[in-house]
Amino acid sequence: QYIFSPDKKFRTWRRLWIALAETEKELGLPITQEQIDELKAHKDEINFDVAKEREKLVRHDVMSHVYAYGVQCPTAKGIIHLGATSCYVGDNTDIIIMTEALKLVRKKLISVLDELAKFADKYKAQPTLAFTHFQPAQPTTVGKRATLWTMELKQDLDDLDYVLGSLRLLGSKGTAGTQASFLELFDGDHAKCRKVDQMIAEKMGFDGCYPVSGQ
């Protein structure tokens, strides 16, 4: 349940803001280590009350939480969400949460497969009646029947691994997916813009980002 909780969601937003600030600092923007440290010091202290009151005024969830984080981090407030758009925290967080949830399902699925394998081996010689077209057919064993369940779940595991292996972060591509805001921040340096996505992905534990997006 915690994986899908508001606390998990907004803590992940803050982790993404820290990753963005670190990346921008490493690529030469005037961001100080003091600002990074301040962000890290408050990353798990979500001030929901401040964000809620701010959202009543601005009607924007992301900007409300940028403001709330800035209240806790006055030195760093000017560099929170720098160059990014709402999808940077929204979509990336969805992908991170989906990945963590699927990994949890995978862990539980492997446990079920392990127990089924033991069950099938234990009852491999236990006779039972098999059916076809809902009619009694021929003898089989309980263990043999269990291997059918195991095979289907193994196929589910293969599908799950394929999905997990194909998931990437959105990255940070700006308002229209062109990274125009970053191109401006980096004074037209395309090489630095290209590095932004990969560096953020690595900081968040992903191999890379999707190459194109609308935002």
PLM regions and their residue ranges:
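Amphipathic, heptad-repeat alpha-helical segments used for oligomerization and assembly
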Residues: 206-215
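A helix-coil-helix interface module used to build multimeric assemblies
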Residues: 1-180, 186-203
